[in-house]
């Protein structure tokens, strides 16, 4: 948000002549906006020109106050302004109210970001006889998107059979994202083994409870889970067990599959590689580097 505001401020500053000797009307408009007086803010901003008007409009749309027509008009008029993804997310309710054509148009190229948007988009796709696209959107959202218990129930009520094979994958992804409430919402939908694994991972992430007992109680099929190993590694780092953390990371650095989500390890791997650059643990550094090309994207090579 701060980066978007800073960029927008620069855009505005470059678009208008400087008058340092007196306050700009945009400043007064921003004050009115912060007070909740959106209409007054827009009127005041007109005194500062078209860019100032759109600065206020940008804020208003990002607050979820725009109609479908206002949102699409702004996006076509200011396609290069920052924060578009958030503006689009905040506008999904207005898009849904507009009906199927608007939904299909708006989400072409940039899919929905909210559970409600995903469900509405899928429904519109189904009514347009685009079954494959609808199912792909639903499964992707189910496997990746955090959502409330109410939204989760809506997904299951509407598309339960389609989503059932992906319950364990959703639980796993919520744990990678450290979305503990969303993970716990899945407990009744997965196996006892998956639930036990999730409880161990949550305890590790929270530095909570007897993690060794939880890990020891896991069935053999879950003991080598990549997400569990990532959480064990992070737990050791945070607890100050650096040497054993390095050993664990080395044991997982044999393939991308063993890491589970290589990007989740990347920062720690780079940090440890920098530490090892002194040569005090040169063999370990060489071993990790040997596996890096298999495990990380090119930008993550150590």
Model-predicted regions and their roles:
Residues 5, 10, 20-302:
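Alpha-helical solenoid repeat scaffolds
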Residues 13-17:
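Hydrophobic membrane-targeting alpha-helices
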């Amino acid at each position: 948000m701060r980066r978007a505001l800073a960029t927008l401020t620069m855009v505005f500053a470059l678009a208008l002549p400087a008058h340092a000797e007196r306050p700009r009307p945009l400043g007064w408009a921003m004050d009115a906006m912060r007070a909740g007086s959106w209409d007054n803010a827009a009127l005041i901003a007109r005194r500062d020109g078209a860019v100032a008007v759109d600065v206020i409009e940008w804020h208003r749309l990002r607050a979820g106050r725009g109609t479908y027509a206002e949102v699409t008009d702004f996006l076509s008029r200011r396609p290069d302004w920052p924060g578009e993804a958030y503006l689009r997310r905040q506008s999904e309710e207005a898009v849904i109210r507009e009906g199927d054509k608007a939904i299909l148009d708006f989400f072409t190229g940039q899919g929905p970001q909210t559970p409600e948007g995903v469900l509405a988009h899928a429904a519109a796709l189904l009514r347009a006889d685009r079954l494959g696209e609808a199912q792909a959107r639903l499964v992707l959202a189910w496997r990746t998107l955090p959502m409330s218990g109410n939204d989760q129930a809506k997904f299951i009520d509407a598309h339960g059979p389609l989503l059932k094979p992906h319950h364990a994958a959703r639980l796993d992804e919520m744990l990678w994202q450290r979305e503990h409430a969303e993970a716990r919402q899945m407990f009744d939908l997965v196996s006892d083994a998956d639930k036990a694994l999730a409880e161990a991972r949550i305890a590790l992430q929270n530095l909570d409870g007897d993690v060794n007992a939880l890990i020891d109680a896991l069935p053999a099929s879950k003991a080598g889970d990549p997400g569990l190993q990532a959480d064990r590694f992070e737990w050791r780092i945070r607890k100050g067990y650096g040497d054993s953390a390095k050993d664990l990371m080395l044991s997982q650095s044999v393939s991308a599959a063993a890491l589970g989500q290589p990007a989740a390890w990347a920062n720690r791997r780079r940090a440890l590689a920098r530490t090892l650059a002194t040569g005090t643990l040169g063999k370990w550094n060489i071993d990790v580097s040997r596996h890096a090309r298999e495990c990380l994207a090119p930008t993550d090579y150590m």
